[in-house]
UniProtKB/Swiss-Prot annotation:
The active site is at 103 (proton acceptor). The gene is rpiA. GO terms for cellular component: cytosol. PANTHER family: RIBOSE-5-PHOSPHATE ISOMERASE. GO terms for molecular function: ribose-5-phosphate isomerase activity. Belongs to the ribose 5-phosphate isomerase family. This is Ribose-5-phosphate isomerase A. Catalyzes the reversible conversion of ribose-5-phosphate to ribulose 5-phosphate. Its EC number is 5.3.1.6. It comes from the Bacteria. It catalyses: aldehydo-D-ribose 5-phosphate = D-ribulose 5-phosphate.
Amino acid sequence: MDQLSMKKMAAQAALQYVKPDSIIGVGSGSTVNCFIEVLGTIKETIKGAVAASKASEELLLRQGIEVFSANDVSGLDIYVDGADEINPQKMMIKGGGAALTREKIVAALAKKFICIVDSSKQVDVLGSTFALPIEVIPMARSQVARKLVALGGSPEYRENVVTDNGNVILDVYNFKIMNPIEMEKELNNVAGVVTNGIFALRSADIVIVGTPEGTKIIG
């Protein structure tokens, strides 16, 4: 079974957590695109969605799903998003699509975080296969990069990428993240960092994994 089929399988399984008349938090990325597609099949049963990126907002509108601002809601029942890596404790690295800050904002509104992935995203230690994205204020890029080197990382500027918030991304290689919660806090305290792609303080509640053998739910 190919990767896209596994992503579609996980996306389809996430529909079981969608409650009638609710507003759904929606992340961004290729697996979320699959979820938006299947969400369109039940659009008459929900009020709408809050999107974590402009790209997801456009896809939702194309499906005929009303999009609300995060400022329009006081809370969300569920937030559905993918991950670039996820460990057994349901902590993640996210931000391959540069939407990490808005993803954290929308995730923080939700009672339940549902992560949908294919099996290639499962790792024992975060940072094993994927660089850690960090959103940085442009004027602080070099300063933050020096700090990341001092912490043992190898930052690379993601060229020609500007986030929806007008900032830049540094991708940090060679971080083996043994204590994700502490690392998330430490990096967020660096002057000039908007946020980093570790989702440990707000980890997933339910993980739906598309595998060659079928869908696996970790709750």
